[in-house]
């Protein structure tokens, strides 16, 4: 499976949710994050959900989390 790591894409959103310690909630943006349409899990293809989960899991495994001080 080839992973699209573009900003706002499913992999990026999964890794960002993990980084900021947000709950797992598959979604992505059609273009720029927060400046374009958000696609919710119910409208995502199986591969897009898998990419989101991979991004989330990769970040969890790396232990790279926001330090809220």
Per-range role (PLM):
Residues 1-69:
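Intrinsic-disorder/low-complexity detector
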């Amino acid at each position: 499976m080839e992973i699209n790591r573009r900003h706002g894409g499913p992999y990026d959103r999964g890794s960002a949710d993990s980084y900021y310690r947000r709950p797992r909630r598959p979604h992505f943006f059609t273009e720029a994050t927060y400046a374009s349409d958000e696609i919710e899990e119910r409208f995502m293809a199986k591969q897009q959900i898998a990419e989101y989960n991979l991004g989330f899991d990769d970040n969890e495994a790396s232990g790279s989390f926001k330090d809220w001080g």
